[in-house]
Amino acid sequence: FDTFGTKERLRGAPIDGEALVGLRSTLGPLVEVVSQEEEEATVRFAVWTALRPESANLTQFQLLEAKNVDEGVAVTSTWFGPSQNVVMADASGRIGWTISGFIPKRLGFDGSTPVPWSSDCRWDWGAQAPRPSVVDPESGVLFTANNRVAGWEYAPAIGENWDPGYRASRIRDLLAQKQEHDEQSLLDIALDTRVE
């Protein structure tokens, strides 16, 4: 274990009493001591890409320099931290969707339930799982509202529980009402709260 945290609050104001210091292992920060015996303890760690040191990168700003959707998708794969849906378009009218964030390969488990570190389950932090992307779909339309966009073959890497798609269906229907959209019509869609 090593320690992390600080004994000061924002702007250097000292804390009276308890210090904000935690314990961290190669897995991540310690979040709970489940049981403790004389020589053995059962503990829980938080293993999350946002808590990895390499997640504090700012490569998302390279999207500002991407010249087309292909470059945008490539830049997005280097943007670590928690995964996010990323939808993009370029000046030529091409569109794309992908997922940002580091997606480690899971070895020996699918991520749907917590696993003990003592098992054979591991994360390969040196290699990423296959990253889904959709570029220039036949429909000519991309939309996402935390619903499943990628095929089921990506479920072991990114998860199996998605929004049921009510909001995404509404967005699809509103997009279909016009052949072309501008900033105002897209803002209207974003602010729409109806579900039909």
Predicted regions and their residues:
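Mature extracytoplasmic enzyme cores
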Residues: 1-196
